[in-house]
Amino acid sequence: MLLIHGFPTSSFDWAAMWPALSAAYSLHALDMLGFGLSDKPKAFLYSLSASADQWQDYVLSQGLREVDVVAHDYGDTVLQELLARQNEGRLPFRIQRATFLNGGLFPEATFPILMQKLLLGPLGPVVARLSSFGRFCASMRSIAGAPLAEQELQWHWQLLAHDNGRAVMPKIIQYIQERRHNRARWTSALQQAGIPLHLIVGDRDPISGKTIAARWQKLLPNCTLTVLEGAGHYPQWEAPGGVLTAMDVAS
């Protein structure tokens, strides 16, 4: 099973679910370039497609032939791009099942928060430079449905800030524009996937919660949906047991 993290965090996102998932699957997680403990080159052209390339190269290096994939947030669209390549016969391995957690699968149903808008704009580098642990906590708590422990947020902040990670955030967040430009390709990737697709969504997420769930039901009526009441943008932190139950994995 591949576990694809979101923005602006890292594969540490999966820590609460790791013990249960590892009892059922051989797990593979990595920090994509610009995230977590991976390199954060300033001159790199960050994109969702480049992140999909990284995952494709990794899977090939591990000799994996068939995989299930769970993704969140930014990772959702990395998975959409991998599915698009699979539909085109260009993916050198087989995705058998895909599970999506809260993320902007459909740009028209996604509502970025203020910090995302500021990072995306012309003052993004200044905003990133002035960011702090306190502001990070405020942003993360604004999109959560359940309380987030300060120690956990501290770990995530340390991984984000590692190797001057704040400096590349304005570059990476251009993925929001990339989603808009590739909306048709990545929506079609889901509609033409021909494999089981499942969306697990926390309904208290102001970015990609109920609106994404409603859009999923309209565009993908034959695919499954689980709504976790009271959870926000990070159901894998806030309600790991609910996510595992939705995935039919014993917690």
Show which residues each predicted segment covers:
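Conserved HGGG/HGGXW glycine-rich cap/lid loop of the alpha/beta-hydrolase fold
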Residues: 1-37
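Active-site loop/oxyanion-hole signature of alpha/beta-hydrolase fold enzymes
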Residues: 28-71, 84, 91, 245
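Conserved hydrolase catalytic core segment
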Residues: 65-110
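Conserved alpha/beta-hydrolase catalytic His-Asp/Glu region
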Residues: 106-109, 130-191
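Short alpha-helix in the alpha/beta-hydrolase fold that links the catalytic acid
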Residues: 152, 186-187, 195, 209-218
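Short beta-strand/loop motif that positions the catalytic acidic residue
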Residues: 193, 199-201
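Acidic catalytic loop of the alpha/beta-hydrolase fold
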Residues: 204-208
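Catalytic histidine-centered segment of alpha/beta-hydrolase-like enzymes
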Residues: 228-244
